[in-house]
Swiss-Prot record:
Belongs to the class-I aminoacyl-tRNA synthetase family. The keyword Metal-binding applies. Monomer. Its main location: cytoplasm. Pfam families: CysS_C, DALR_2, tRNA-synt_1e. HAMAP family: Cys_tRNA_synth. GO terms for biological process: cysteinyl-tRNA aminoacylation. InterPro entries: Cys-tRNA-ligase (IPR015803), Cys-tRNA-synt_Ia_DALR (IPR015273), Cys-tRNA/MSH_ligase (IPR024909), CysS_C (IPR056411), Rossmann-like_a/b/a_fold (IPR014729), tRNA-synt_1_cat_dom (IPR032678), tRNAsynth_Ia_anticodon-bd (IPR009080). A motif ('KMSKS' region) lies at residues 278-282. This is Cysteine--tRNA ligase. Its EC number is 6.1.1.16.
């Protein structure tokens, strides 16, 4: 059946940057109208950090846009529930491994939900797919891509795979020449990696053709992705830090085992730095998602993450979050102005969404999102709408402001922002102010919003902001030169 929505033609215009080829390319799924996507998920031994949040939100945004275009998306994100770090943490805590992993799986789901992320269609756990991992290892050994060491470990022989390094653009000979890696006794090459680890006392273990043991990390994703999506699928994603060695090793394992291309497109989310430095527990700049959401509204965190292109490197700081909070507030304020003038609460339905995408500004939004999921440019389109709403409201053009507000909220729903009732969001802001959590930048942002409200003759909102700030101990002084403030 032919699609008749404004997005009917847009489906074929999507381009995605492929990390393997190093260029943007037209997206052509294996099956018409369907997308299989696998994203490397979390190793569940601790609370998720802000880098995990970027992966969660980035691929949630991609899934939502693919679905908006009309694709039937099968989104798979695995859970690594057996790993050295998990074993170590459980031992440190004196906790059963299953209890530890379930606790952090639950926390991960809570964080993802708070950030407005859809649940994956499938969420395979490594420990549920040991058989598939063993079968893939057996195939690799049989075809001379892997070998068993005398110590009971099984290794992948990187020399056996001619294309090793094609994703990360690394040459194996150059890597070996510059390597300071000491060759383990049972390895033929220092870059050979473990597929099966021989059992150690007091560690989880499974019976295998090579003795008791457990799988290596890399084979887990190869086996689970193939089980859920087949030998070849459309999109494989994860954080940029996984490109080498994890994703490189996945390609080597999977393509050697199946003889098929592994993934048609590779997407990698950029790093997050904290105040210009790499996030690290040793530097004391490590923040969990919960740390951040204790200080900022979850929608503010989502907005911050979407405000940069998913592949770009992002600097995380209080000032950046404050700026995102202020920006999001201004978008909500534009909706509030339109609602107050119209005397109605704005509710979006499918017809309004179609109207929004059929508009000129909707076409700009489509163009941005179809350019490798460029949410940053798409958000700039939303700000253009907000400015036009304020202009129309100031001119008392109620119907134009209302139509533009419909477009704003309808387009924003694809990014899953601006979907709260306006008053609910503003009440949450009041709660933040009451807790005296505002930085100088946040106060300045509210003062700018108050000035905008006055310009648009929305004196009720201007007074509301003054009261909010007063309750937080902030005194305002208005003069012809502008507004100054001080903490009482």
């Amino acid at each position: 059946m032919t699609m008749t929505t404004p997005l009917a033609d847009a489906m074929s215009q999507l381009v995605i940057y492929d990390s393997l080829t190093g260029r943007k390319q037209a997206f052509k799924p294996l099956a018409t109208g369907k997308v299989g996507m696998y994203v490397c998920g979390m190793t569940v031994y601790d609370y998720c950090h802000i880098g995990h949040a970027r992966v969660m939100v980035g691929f949630d945004m991609a899934v939502r846009w693919l679905a908006q275009l009309g694709y039937d998306v099968n989104y798979v994100r695995n859970i690594t529930d057996i790993d050295d770090k998990i074993i170590t943490r459980a031992a440190e805590n004196g906790e059963e491994i299953g209890t530890l992993t379930q606790r952090f799986i639950t926390a991960m789901h809570e964080d993802a939900t708070a950030l407005g992320c859809l649940s994956p269609d499938a969420e395979p756990r490594a420990t549920d797919h040991i058989d598939e991992m063993q079968q893939m290892i057996e195939t690799l050994v049989s075809n001379d891509y892997a070998y068993a060491g005398d110590n009971g470990d099984v290794y992948y022989a990187v020399d056996s795979f001619a294309d090793y390094g094609k994703l990360s653009k690394r040459n194996l000979d150059d890597m070996q020449a510059g390597s300071r890696v000491e060759v383990e006794n049972d390895k033929r090459n220092p870059f050979d990696f473990v597929l099966w680890k021989a059992a150690k006392p007091d560690e989880p273990q499974w019976a295998s053709a090579w003795g008791q043991g457990r799988p290596g990390w890399h084979i887990e994703c190869s086996a689970m992705s193939t089980k859920c999506l087949g030998n070849t699928f459309d999109i494989h994603g994860g954080g940029h830090d996984l490109q080498f060695p994890h994703h490189e090793n996945e390609i080597a394992q999977s393509e050697a085992a199946t003889g098929c291309e592994y993934a048609r497109n590779w997407m990698h989310v950029g790093f997050i730095n904290v105040d210009g430095e790499k996030m690290s527990k040793s530097l004391g700049n490590f923040f969990t998602i919960r740390d951040v959401m204790a200080k900022y509204l979850p929608e503010t965190v989502r907005f911050f993450l979407l405000s940069s292109h998913y592949r770009s490197q992002v600097n995380f700081s209080d000032s950046a979050l404050d700026e995102s909070h202020n920006s999001l507030s201004r978008l909500y304020q534009a909706l509030k102005v339109a609602e107050q003038q119209k005397g109605k609460v704005l509710i979006i339905d499918e017809a309004l969404i179609n109207n929004a995408y059929a508009s000129a500004v909707g076409q700009d939004f489509i163009k941005a999102m179809n350019d490798d999921f460029n949410s940053s440019t798409a958000i700039s389109v939303l700000f253009g709408l907000a400015r036009d709403i304020n202009k129309a409201s100031k001119a008392q053009d109620v119907e134009t402001a209302w139509q533009l507000a419909q477009h704003l909220k309808a387009l924003a729903q694809t990014l899953n922002i601006l979907q709260q009732p306006v008053q609910q969001f503003l009440q949450a802001v009041i709660g933040e102010v009451a807790e005296d959590s505002l930085t100088d930048e946040a106060i300045d942002g509210l003062i700018i919003e108050r000035a905008d409200a006055k310009t648009n003759k929305n004196f009720a909102r201007a007074d509301e902001i003054r009261v909010q700030l007063k309750e937080a101990g902030i005194e305002l002084e208005d003069s012809r030169a502008g507004t100054t403030w001080r903490r009482a």
